[in-house]
């Protein structure tokens, strides 16, 4: 380490961590610490040669030696001859180290115990054996000589003395760290490496291979990093500078000390005692014990509690060792390097500031004065109001009137940053211009509350002052609230009115029958507004008015258009504040929260930021004013209980009684009864809610003609809910419907519902039941917040180094985007999915593939989305970060539009962190619970047919059918789909159709809305013949392989195949089958699985499409569906689900081999005759039959899919589709919109590593994990040299694993498992290139993203320039002195330039 005084050059590009050799430790040290004393208890001066010695570590006071002979600056650098202290600043006590010479070597515990044990790997010994040697339990042979002993053999005392008697001093055996050190010194790295390289190809067993390649890697790491193995055992121990382990006097003569001092004291005491014992040549057993104690005390100093019991202090808590100092949330990394406290900041409670403009915040005068103090002093001085800083300080303290004027000048156009914790995404920290206010609370603009997730129930916010010019510039240009209108998560406006504002706008945009002024016609908008102002026209009256609109086309040309519109008077108030260029239709509707959001979005896209901001402000003022005037309030009479409620509940009670009776008679089981009861009550609850909403939603009113007319209700509660201002249907249901079913704390549902609502009031029992749910809610919220925060932290960590680094990587690859379909319905149109992305291939017209509609490389904006929609395009290829070709970072073409700005993403945008925040921020809104679905609820909802919603044309896809005798088509393919298109050819619906369904329409048929197009039996799985012919039974014998079943209802008898376990031993190997002799004379065998019910008789003629047998589907029992946050975490951690789906490993024909106990042998044979077999447990339901052809990656046995299988069998695009859709499903359920891009960014990071399957001509081995980018570069190099490239498979790593496997050890160490990461890095001598954001924050530099990217670029160019200059200077052979001075001035110039922000 360089001391700050030695003016070192702090320009560096990478950091390396290695083992410290004894010489290096000596070179750091300024002297040996010989005594355990700290300071003299009388004089409080440090003891000489002790842990705080001034001679070693430097003076305690600035420029003053210990004895006081030399004081003041002029003696700087003098070493006092009396006390030996160098006269210099006391700061050197922070970086001068000392050392302790150990009397006996000591093994470093990290390299011993941190798994895998490095010492163990190098010596090829088990940890247990090494520990026995180290802690003096047994001897180890280090030099066998000519004896029968072997090197590395362990001997206990008895064996050792026997061997001594037998061989004398022919051999050497030692114990303790000394022995281990000798053995490590003896290792010949090159020889061992060569031996292993020869041995590896010959080994057969996987475990041996793994161990050998691990050992080889470690040996090579030692060889390449110039670390010596024996350095893992220390002879000399460095001592931390004393100011980093301070001794602080408390009042009452006591001291607070760092735990490290205690730990060092123990080491020094034991070391000195050992030295003395060795001088006295004490008995072996005593010395041995002392050496063991020394080893233990050094262990405790380095990592307390890693081995044995942790050493505790006086108060019984374990002492904090050096390792504890750096790890964990309170450790050096997370507490001090990644999270620092910030000066020039304050915090206070927030209150609403409804009069502010969007870019302003109200700052209390007192706070402002404190925050801007230095600036205020400066202004007072420069205006001559104060002569000295001291005078200015006095004026500010007295708060004289001039001070406020100066403060106002200082604050003008000097933005401040407001931050609300928890800062879950970048909008939690925004810049505002301060407005000075009285009082002590910060005023916040209501529209930014959504972004901060703030409310005014006592929330606090922090204020920070950007000091430098660059910081102010950045705050204004990038962080100002007016520049953050769109949410980075989905590109929709986040500056959206909510609550009162929505209520006000909704109220004035609603029409009411027979309002004052109904039917009036106005020539101009102003005329109508005057009428409203003079109370001649009510805001809810329906009127006609002449409106002039201005249309602006793409080139900016304006055209005016006047027309008469039917509207509501209040909507003109909104039209009055709308910017020029917007159409009247956009505000001529009921202003619910959704519509207001649409309005602001459209305003942003049409007329730009500035207008939108002003419009949003005006909307807010209007909304607040009108909400006040509307007089909407809430009263108990607004909670109207539906008259039908009583009747609905009576019906339900009767149904429940019936089920209870059935249960008592034994017709249904207890589980079924419970499920059915719960089912009835949840249906009833919905019925009551519907009746209530229908009742609330309309009013009867007398119109102008005196007749009764129905209109939308003006009930206050309904208005609040309908507008989206406050309250949901579910909450109103509890007020005026029925409370319904409650859950117990364990998540199970209590079957007696609460039939009352809050208006009627609850009985004691009902109240007690509902307390359950309320408590669970609070406990859940606390858990959820912690879990969600941890998910965000893992996401940020895995994606932090992903930055846009270039404009275009030139790749042709991408993802195929299709509309998102669920339950046959299109939930997300293609246009919504591809908006803001770049096309990867040309998009052609549907009817003409030669004609290009959109060329490749086009950024799809709103205009193009319309084009896609109008041309009925169903799928298009777009660029994606997953397929981006750049090694570090991604290119802006693959990323597309920056969602928060609405244009193509800038170079330097840190998209990784943005993605992590966008996914993590809504985490708190997701549920934590696992859904128990089962019983009546799920079995009732089994589909058995498909009915289309809208009319259109049916298209069959992947469909293989046979014509049945009854004229229907029967499907005999697995992944058949029916798509429905409208008259323009746009896809409207899409359905998956199961194997064995009857299709009731033909391809290209026109179908009507509501028509059933396919049906099937949901409870059995059919075996269908594709050919006509004669069926013959093979090995189907009653009593052996089958049994005759008689159907009670119909009296028909049929064969049922017996399961293997139910057959007699002689019939176990028989394979029951139906052999079909087709009319063409071919023979087709259909093997029958267990429990098949045969539907044909022996020798019967069958038609194509006939069902030969049916396999009953096991009715799905209660399945737990993991939902919400845990599901998202599972997906990103790439966990293998339990009982996951089994997929076909290759394309080929299926056959079943000999069964083993409990397993079926499943075989696939491909065209080349290659065979893949696997054993599948018998209880798994296999979807394919003998002789069927399956495609690679096709699902054979149902279950949740395993992402690793998808990657291996179907490739990375299929994997991306799967993860994106699964994650989106969870968020969609909660109504949260996140752009797919963000999820893709995380997937890219999960796919960074590859596993090597064949090393080719490289020095990698099978099973190595390497970065994808490195392998690409390596292969390019190998191919250029005509060598064999490396073969590899892409790996999918969970986010935690991926974060720890990152190239940067600083980033990994600051994430988790600090000890393990640092140990591994030190042994291999790892170099951190400081590419990511985190590493740069840790070393205290600007991050290489955003404005920092330019800084780093400039820095690199300067460094290169310097090197060139150096070469030139060498060439001119200039004298060294001028050279040095040049560089000093050069550095200064560069520093100045940076400070002025010229870069």
Curated annotation (Swiss-Prot):
Ligand binding (Zn(2+) 2): 809, 884, 891, 894
Q: Which Pfam families match?
A: RNA_pol_Rpb1_1, RNA_pol_Rpb1_2, RNA_pol_Rpb1_3, RNA_pol_Rpb1_4, RNA_pol_Rpb1_5
The record's Gene Ontology biological-process terms are: DNA-templated transcription
Origin, by domain of life? Answer: Bacteria
Question: What keywords were assigned to this record?
Answer: DNA-directed RNA polymerase, Magnesium, Metal-binding, Nucleotidyltransferase, Transcription, Transferase, Zinc
Q: Where does Zn(2+) 1 bind?
A: 65, 67, 80, 83
Assembly state and interactors? The RNAP catalytic core consists of 2 alpha, 1 beta, 1 beta' and 1 omega subunit. When a sigma factor is associated with the core the holoenzyme is formed, which can initiate transcription.
Q: Which Gene3D superfamilies match?
A: 1.10.132.30, 1.10.150.390, 1.10.1790.20, 1.10.40.90, 2.40.40.20, 2.40.50.100, RNA polymerase II, clamp domain, RNA polymerase Rpb1, domain 3
In terms of InterPro entries, this protein maps to:
DNA-dir_RpoC_beta_prime, DNA-dir_RpoC_beta_prime_bact, RNA_pol_asu, RNA_pol_N, RNA_pol_Rpb1_1, RNA_pol_Rpb1_3, RNA_pol_Rpb1_3_sf, RNA_pol_Rpb1_4
- Name of protein: DNA-directed RNA polymerase subunit beta'
Which source organism? Psychrobacter cryohalolentis (strain ATCC BAA-1226 / DSM 17306 / VKM B-2378 / K5)
Q: Which reaction(s) are listed as its catalytic activity?
A: RNA(n) + a ribonucleoside 5'-triphosphate = RNA(n+1) + diphosphate
Q: List the disulfide bonds.
A: none
**Molecular functions per Gene Ontology:** DNA binding; DNA-directed RNA polymerase activity; magnesium ion binding; zinc ion binding
Q: What EC number(s) does this enzyme carry?
A: 2.7.7.6
Q: Name one GO cellular component term.
A: DNA-directed RNA polymerase complex
Function (record text): DNA-dependent RNA polymerase catalyzes the transcription of DNA into RNA using the four ribonucleoside triphosphates as substrates.
Q: How is the cofactor bound?
A: Binds 1 Mg(2+) ion per subunit.
């Amino acid at each position: 380490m360089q001391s700050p005084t030695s003016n070192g050059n702090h320009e560096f590009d990478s950091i390396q961590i290695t083992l410290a050799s004894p010489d290096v430790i000596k070179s750091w040290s300024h002297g040996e610490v010989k005594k355990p004393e700290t300071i003299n208890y009388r004089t409080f001066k440090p003891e000489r040669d002790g842990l705080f010695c001034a001679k070693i570590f430097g003076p305690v006071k600035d420029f003053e030696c210990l004895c006081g002979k030399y004081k003041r600056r002029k003696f700087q650098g003098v070493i006092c001859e009396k006390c030996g202290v160098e006269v210099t600043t006391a700061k050197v006590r922070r970086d001068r180290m000392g050392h302790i010479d150990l009397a006996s070597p000591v093994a470093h515990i990290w390299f011993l115990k941190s798994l895998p044990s490095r010492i163990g790997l190098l010596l090829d010994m088990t940890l247990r054996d090494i520990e026995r040697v180290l802690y003096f339990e047994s001897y180890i042979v280090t030099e066998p000589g000519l004896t029968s002993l072997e090197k590395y053999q362990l001997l206990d005392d008895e064996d050792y003395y026997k061997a001594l008697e037998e061989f004398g001093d022919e051999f050497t055996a030692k114990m303790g760290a000394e022995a281990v050190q000798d053995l490590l010194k003896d290792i010949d790295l090159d020889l061992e490496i060569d031996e292993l390289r020869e041995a590896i190809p010959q080994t057969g067993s996987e475990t041996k291979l793994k161990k050998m390649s691990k050992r080889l890697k470690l040996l090579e790491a030692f060889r390449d990093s110039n670390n010596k193995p024996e350095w893992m055992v220390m002879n000399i121990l460095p001592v931390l500078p004393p100011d980093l382990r301070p001794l602080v006097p408390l009042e009452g003569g006591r001291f607070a000390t760092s735990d490290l001092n205690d730990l060092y004291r123990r080491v020094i005491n034991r070391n000195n005692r050992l030295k003395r014992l060795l001088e006295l040549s004490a008995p072996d057993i005593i010395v041995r014990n002392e050496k063991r104690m020394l080893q233990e005390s050094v262990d405790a100093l380095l990592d307390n509690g890693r081995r044995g019991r942790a050493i505790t202090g006086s108060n019984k808590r374990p002492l904090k060792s050096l390792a504890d100092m750096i790890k964990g949330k309170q450790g050096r990394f997370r507490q001090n390097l990644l999270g620092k406290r910030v000066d020039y900041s304050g915090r206070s409670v927030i209150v609403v500031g409804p009069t502010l403009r969007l870019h302003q915040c109200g700052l209390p005068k007192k706070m402002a004065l404190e925050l801007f103090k230095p600036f205020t002093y400066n202004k007072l001085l420069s205006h001559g109001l104060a002569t000295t800083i001291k005078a200015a300080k006095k004026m500010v303290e007295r708060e004289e009137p001039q001070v406020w004027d100066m403060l106002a000048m200082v604050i003008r156009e000097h933005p401040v940053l407001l931050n609300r914790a928890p800062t879950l995404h970048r909008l939690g920290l925004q810049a505002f211009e301060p407005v000075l206010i009285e009082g002590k609370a910060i005023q916040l603009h209501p529209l930014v509350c959504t972004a901060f997730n703030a409310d005014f129930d006592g929330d606090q916010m922090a204020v920070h002052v950007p000091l430098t010019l660059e910081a102010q510039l950045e705050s204004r240009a990038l962080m100002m609230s007016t520049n953050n209108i769109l949410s980075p998560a989905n590109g929709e406006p986040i500056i959206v009115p909510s609550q009162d504002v929505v209520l006000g706008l909704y109220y004035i945009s609603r029409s009411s029958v027979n309002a004052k002024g109904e039917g009036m016609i106005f020539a101009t908008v102003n005329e109508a507004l005057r009428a409203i102002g003079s109370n001649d026209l009510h805001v809810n009256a329906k009127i006609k008015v002449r409106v002039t609109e201005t249309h602006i086309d793409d080139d900016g040309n304006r055209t005016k258009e006047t027309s008469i519109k039917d509207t509501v008077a209040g909507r003109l108030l909104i039209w009055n504040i709308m910017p020029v260029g917007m159409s009247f239709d956009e505000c001529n509707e009921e202003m619910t929260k959704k519509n207001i959001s649409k309005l602001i979005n459209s305003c942003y896209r049409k007329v730009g930021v500035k207008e939108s901001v002003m419009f949003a402000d005006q909307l807010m003022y209007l909304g607040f004013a009108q909400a006040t005037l509307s007089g909407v309030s809430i009263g108990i009479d607004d909670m109207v209980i539906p008259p039908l409620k009583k009747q609905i509940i009576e019906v339900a009670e009767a149904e429940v009684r019936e089920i209870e009776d059935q249960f008592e008679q034994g017709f249904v089981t207890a589980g079924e009864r419970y499920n059915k009861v719960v089912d009835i009550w949840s249906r009833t609850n919905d019925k009551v809610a519907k009746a209530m909403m229908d009742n609330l939603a309309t009013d009867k009113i007398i119109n102008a003609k005196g007749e009764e007319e129905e209109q939308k209700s003006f009930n206050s509660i309904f208005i609040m809910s309908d507008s989206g201002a406050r309250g949901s249907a579910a909450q109103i249901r509890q007020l005026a419907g029925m409370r319904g079913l409650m859950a117990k704390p364990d998540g199970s549902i209590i079957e007696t519902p609460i039939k009352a609502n809050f208006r009627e009031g609850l009985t004691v029992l009902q109240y007690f039941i509902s307390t359950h749910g309320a408590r669970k809610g609070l406990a859940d919220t606390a858990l959820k917040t912690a879990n969600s925060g941890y998910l965000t932290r893992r996401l940020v960590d895995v994606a932090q180094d992903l930055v846009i680094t270039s404009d275009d990587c030139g790749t042709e690859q991408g993802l195929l985007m299709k509309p998102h379909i669920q339950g046959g319905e299109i939930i997300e149109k293609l246009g919504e999915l591809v908006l803001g992305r770049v096309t990867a291939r040309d998009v052609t017209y549907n009817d003409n593939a030669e004609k290009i509609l959109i060329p490749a490389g086009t950024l799809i904006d709103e205009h193009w989305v319309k084009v896609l929609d109008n041309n009925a395009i169903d799928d298009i290829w777009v660029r994606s970060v997953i397929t981006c070709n750049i090694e570090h970072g991604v290119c802006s073409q693959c990323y597309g539009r920056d969602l928060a700005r609405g244009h193509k993403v800038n170079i330097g945008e840190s998209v990784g962190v943005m993605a992590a925040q966008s996914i993590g921020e809504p985490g708190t809104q997701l549920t934590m619970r696992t859904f128990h679905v089962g019983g009546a609820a799920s079995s009732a909802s089994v589909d058995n047919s498909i009915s289309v919603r809208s009319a259109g044309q049916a298209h069959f896809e992947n469909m293989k059918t046979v014509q049945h005798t009854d004229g229907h088509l029967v499907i005999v393919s697995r992944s058949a789909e029916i798509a429905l298109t409208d008259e323009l050819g746009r896809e409207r619906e899409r359905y998956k159709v199961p194997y064995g369904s009857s299709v009731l329409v033909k391809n290209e048929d026109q179908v009507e809305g509501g028509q059933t197009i396919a049906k099937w039996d949901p409870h059995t799985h059919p075996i269908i013949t594709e050919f006509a012919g004669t069926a013959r039974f093979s090995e189907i014998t009653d009593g052996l392989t089958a049994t005759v079943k008689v159907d009670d209802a119909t009296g028909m008898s049929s064969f049922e195949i017996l399961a293997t376990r139910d057959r007699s031993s002689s019939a176990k190997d028989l394979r029951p089958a139906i052999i079909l002799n087709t009319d063409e004379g071919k023979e087709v065998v259909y093997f029958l699985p267990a429990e098949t019910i045969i539907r044909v008789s022996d020798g019967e003629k069958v038609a194509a499409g006939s069902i030969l047998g049916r396999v009953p589907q096991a009715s799905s029992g209660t399945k737990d569906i993991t939902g919400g946050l845990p599901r998202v975490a599972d997906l990103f951690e790439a966990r293998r689900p339990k009982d996951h789906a089994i997929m076909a490993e290759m394309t080929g024909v299926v056959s079943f081999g000999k069964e083993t106990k409990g397993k079926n042998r499943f075989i696939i044979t491909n065209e080349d005759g290659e065979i893949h077999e696997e054993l599948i447990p018998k209880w798994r339901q296999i979807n394919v039959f003998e002789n069927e052809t399956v495609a690679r990656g096709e699902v054979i046995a149902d279950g949740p899919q395993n992402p690793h299988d998808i990657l291996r069998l179907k490739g990375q695009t299929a994997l991306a589709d799967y993860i994106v859709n699964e994650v989106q499903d969870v968020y969609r359920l909660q109504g949260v919109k996140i752009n797919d891009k963000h999820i893709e960014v995380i997937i890219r990071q999960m796919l960074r590593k590859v596993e090597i399957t064949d090393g080719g001509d490289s020095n990698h081995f099978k099973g190595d994990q390497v970065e994808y980018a490195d392998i690409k570069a390596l292969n390019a190099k190998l191919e250029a040299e005509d060598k064999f490239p490396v073969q590899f498979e892409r790996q999918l790593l969970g986010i935690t694993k991926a974060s720890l496997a990152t190239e940067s050890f600083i980033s990994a160490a600051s994430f988790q498992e600090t000890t393990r990461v640092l140990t591994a890095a030190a042994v291999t001598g790892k170099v951190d290139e400081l590419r990511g954001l985190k590493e740069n924050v840790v070393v205290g530099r600007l991050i290489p993203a955003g404005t920092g990217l330019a800084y780093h670029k400039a820095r690199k160019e300067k460094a290169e320039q310097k090197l060139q200059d150096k070469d030139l200077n060498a060439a001119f052979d200039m004298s060294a002195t001028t050279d040095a001075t040049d560089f000093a001035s050069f550095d200064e110039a560069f520093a100045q330039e940076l400070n002025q922000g010229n870069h």
